[in-house]
Amino acid sequence: SSRVLKVDCLDLPAKVYIRRDVSLTPEQVKLYMQMKKLALAKLESGELATTASVLTQIMRLQQICCGHLQPDDGEIQTVKSNRLNELLDITEEFQGKAIIWATYTHDIQQVADALRDRFGPESVATYYGATPQDERQQIVEDFQDSDNPLRFFVGQPKTGGYGITLTAANTVIYYSNSYDLEIRLQSEDRAHRIGQSNKVTYIDLVSPGTIDEKILGALRSKIDIAGQVLGEDVQDWLR
């Protein structure tokens, strides 16, 4: 209800949602099916008895959609993906500044490197757990300054999604989504708040027929996924 009141009171511009489909590569399909089979076997054997264990399997499936996999031993395995090229295509379709949210550190670094290669080193800043505290405010100020060449704010929603104002952007791209509804809502509001005079366009990158689609569907329906995955729905999430 407070969200409705916010719009009523502040008369903020509209939010527009766009979904961009990204097909999996054959390598991703193979790895995804293996991981899904493993997750369902663990479910059958009773290994996935906690919310955390189910969310870990969901996270691994999502990582594969993004083009990498980080198993328990921590060694990141990369897999050929179309997602980065799709993102670069999107950046050619709009003018002005943009926020790009990504759940995984590996993706933040890959996205930032690709954008720097295309648009120059001054055009990109990253904002996530490893960003030094004393640099964070300057990044926000530079981004908000229309004369500053910083065009792309590439961040992790759980780090940059709260409390900061990024109204210089009216394009927000979700390279990957958090399964935490509150993090999604808060990260949307970095651009959509007092000071925003333009409509804000939210673009979600989604691999059809995968966990991506289920996560986005739940978020759009304002469902907190962590509260959903342990009941009878758990098989649906992993199928």
Each model region followed by its residue ranges:
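Inter-lobe coupling linker of SF2 helicases/translocases
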Residues: 1-76, 80-96, 202, 219-221
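SF2 helicase motor core recognition
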Residues: 7, 108-112, 151-176, 180-199
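Short glycine-/polar-rich loops that comprise or flank the Walker A/P-loop
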Residues: 15-17, 120-123, 167-171, 196-202
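Conserved nucleotide-binding/hydrolysis micro-motifs of P-loop NTPases
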Residues: 26-29, 105-107, 132, 159-161, ...
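Alpha-helical elements of the RecA-like P-loop NTPase motor core of helicases
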Residues: 30, 85, 109, 113, ...
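Helix N-cap/beta->alpha junction signal
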Residues: 80, 103-106
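Conserved helicase ATPase core of P-loop NTP-dependent helicases/translocases
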Residues: 99-101, 109-110, 119-160
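A conserved SF2-helicase RecA2
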Residues: 179-239
